[in-house]
From Swiss-Prot:
GO biological process, one term: protein localization
Gene: gus
Phenotype on disruption: Homozygous females produce defective eggs, which desiccate and collapse soon after egg laying, or embryos, which hatch very rarely. Mutants exhibit wing morphology defects, including blistering, formation of ectopic vein material, and loss of material at the margin.
Domain SOCS box: 234-279
Domain B30.2/SPRY: 36-233
Mutation effect (residue 204 to S): Does not affect binding to Elongin BC complex or vas
Pfam families, A to Z: SOCS_box, SPRY
Keyword annotations from UniProtKB, A to Z: Cytoplasm, Developmental protein, Nucleus
Localisation: Cytoplasm; Nucleus
InterPro entries per record: B30.2/SPRY, B30.2/SPRY_sf, ConA-like_dom_sf, FBXO45-Fsn/SPSB_families, SOCS_box, SOCS_box-like_dom_sf, SPRY_dom
Record's protein name: Protein gustavus
């Protein structure tokens, strides 16, 4: 699921039992799917510390009663097997500025008919009777339905939009167990990244709001983990940070630490290039 095939991502035709393969970034649309520089910068940095991940984890006080955060793993919640119920949980931290990225781990076998990931305000509903794509059902939330490949916002009044946008009607994008959510409150956009491939902007117009990570689930005993990757402030990066990024780009990510250690540089500079001064 989500395997790279000749630079693309696997898609499945709904009208054919045979798997079909096509590039996720067609040549004519390639510019639309270029990963924004700030996202690239953030993903090049070391992931957030455990303490910061816990700060941005699921909120055990802001959830459906059919959900609980695990005692032995505060980054993961468990949903009770309650029939005819759709259940949500919000993250602890409401985001108003900066770029933020978090990883969702949601096993494909635990998604069921309605599995939605996105963001919401503090007023978005967290429970409904029956099965539905609850995230994105009102004006207070924005969600990506992983099974339907649809984006929903105020879906009671507005139809869902296909995402990734390049999918044809007879294709379904298989979202793997792990993927990234990128919320840029400075630009007011929400986007997703799968297998290091940026899938384009899912939602716009989010500036000026206070938004929380959220998922809605229907599968009994499903367990979903959220791991905060990190954030970037709105201010431009210092010149030293930009120089570090340029050097790391020139070296490349393969065996990066080994290559940096071989450079004829002072230890303090090697430490800086490897971000070891941060943790």
């Amino acid at each position: 699921m989500g395997q790279k095939i000749s630079g693309g991502v696997k898609t499945v035709s709904r009208n054919d039992s045979q798997s079909t393969f096509k590039p996720i970034i067609p040549r004519e649309l390639q510019a639309d799917f270029v990963k924004p520089a700030r996202i690239d910068i953030l993903l090049d940095m070391p992931p957030a510390s455990r303490d910061l991940q816990l700060k941005h984890s699921w909120n055990s006080e802001d959830r459906s009663l059919n959900i609980f955060v695990k005692e032995d793993d505060k980054l993961t919640f468990h949903r009770h097997p309650v029939a005819q119920s759709t259940d949500c949980i919000r993250g602890k931290v409401g985001l108003t500025k900066g770029l933020h990225i978090w990883e969702i781990y949601w096993p494909t076998r635990q998604r069921g008919t309605h599995a939605v990931v996105g963001v919401c305000t503090a007023d978005a509903p967290l429970h409904s009777v029956g099965y539905q794509s609850l995230v994105g059902s009102t004006e207070q939330s924005w969600g990506w339905d992983l099974g339907r490949n649809k984006l929903y916002h105020d879906s009671k009044n507005c139809a869902g939009v296909t995402y990734p946008a390049i999918l044809k009607n007879d294709e379904a994008f298989l979202v793997p167990d792990k993927f990234l959510v990128a919320l840029d409150m400075d630009e007011g956009t929400l986007s997703f990244i799968v297998d290091q491939q940026y899938l384009g902007i899912a939602f716009r117009g989010l500036r000026g709001k206070k938004l929380y990570p959220i998922v809605s689930a229907v599968w009994g005993h499903c367990e979903i983990t959220m791991r905060y990757i990190g954030g970037l402030d709105p201010e431009p990066l210092p010149l030293m940070d930009l120089c570090r990024r340029t050097i790391r780009q020139k070296i490349g990510r393969t065996n990066l630490e080994e290559h940096i250690q071989q450079l004829q540089l002072p230890l303090s500079m090697k430490t800086y290039l490897l971000y070891k001064n941060r943790r």
